[in-house]
Amino acid sequence: MSVPTDRSYTAEHEWVLVDGSVATVGITEFAAEALGDVVFVQLPDVGAQLTAGEACGEIESTKSVSDLFAPVTGSVIEVNSAIDAGPETVNSDPYGAGWLFRVEIATAGELLDAAAYAALTSGE
């Protein structure tokens, strides 16, 4: 399982790549594999105000429906509209083209570095 070191992670299996005051958010390879084939993603609306730790969307797979949680507090400034037409991208490229949304950060949540996230998932 891949855990890129250039980003932070949450205990809910989301990754956060911060560039200045903007966080790009996606789910980890671990989450994508656990979900199975993703068939639908409900993303927050552009302009939505998110609070770190609160549910902000859903990912539906052939196995289950899982909540997406906001890793940071802030305002959604962009969503990956390509996910609507190709939700399987979340499985095939979770750390690249499968990103989900971008947030203008007001406050960062409790984030893990790559080593801490790898340790968390090694026991699951």
Curated annotation (Swiss-Prot):
One of its GO terms (cellular component) is glycine cleavage complex. Residues 22-104 form the Lipoyl-binding domain. One of its GO terms (biological process) is glycine decarboxylation via glycine cleavage system. The modification N6-lipoyllysine is found at K63. Keywords: Lipoyl. Its cofactor is (R)-lipoate. Binds 1 lipoyl cofactor covalently. CDD domains: GCS_H. InterPro entries: 2-oxoA_DH_lipoyl-BS, Biotin_lipoyl, GCV_H, GCV_H/Fam206, GCV_H_sub, Single_hybrid_motif. Disulfide bonds: none annotated. Pfam families: GCV_H. The glycine cleavage system catalyzes the degradation of glycine. The H protein shuttles the methylamine group of glycine from the P protein to the T protein. NCBIfam families: gcvH, PRK01202.1. The glycine cleavage system is composed of four proteins: P, T, L and H. PANTHER family: GLYCINE CLEAVAGE SYSTEM H PROTEIN (PTHR11715), GLYCINE CLEAVAGE SYSTEM H PROTEIN-RELATED (PTHR11715:SF3). Belongs to the GcvH family. This is Glycine cleavage system H protein.
